[in-house]
A protein has these predicted regions:
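Conserved hydrophobic/aromatic packing and binding residues within compact polymer-binding modules
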Residues: 8, 22-23, 33-36, 65
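Recognition helix of helix-turn-helix/homeodomain-like DNA-binding domains
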Residues: 27-44
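The alpha-helix within a helix-turn-helix
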Residues: 12, 23, 55
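Short coil turns linking two alpha-helices in DNA-binding domains
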Residues: 18, 29-32, 47, 61
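A short, Lys/Arg-rich alpha-helix, primarily the initiator
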Residues: 1-14
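Short, basic-rich loop-to-helix N-cap that marks the start of a DNA-contacting helix
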Residues: 16, 40-56
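Short, charged recognition helix plus adjacent turn
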Residues: 44, 56, 64-76
Length: 76
């Protein structure tokens, strides 16, 4: 059973900041960040503005945080 880290956690580690610092920068509560990082909450179902604020705080794109492999959409 491999440990699956959320893209949010990987992006935060890459940015070199704590959950608290990400919370301060983004205005998203630490508890929410923790739940998203531990995959207790699905970031794909988060409000767009929350994902946007997290991405801005981490200096990355929203696509970097969303789990796009889980989203299936038809090309057409």
């Amino acid at each position: 059973h491999k440990i699956h880290y959320s893209k949010l956690k990987l992006a935060r580690i890459r940015a070199g900041i704590s959950q608290q610092e990400l919370s301060d920068r983004s205005g998203v509560p630490v508890k929410s960040i923790g739940n998203l990082e531990q995959l207790r909450r699905d970031i794909n179902r988060c409000r767009v503005d929350i994902v946007f604020r997290l991405a801005q705080a981490l200096d990355c794109s929203m696509e970097d945080l969303l789990d796009l492999e889980k989203v299936s959409y038809k090309k057409g």
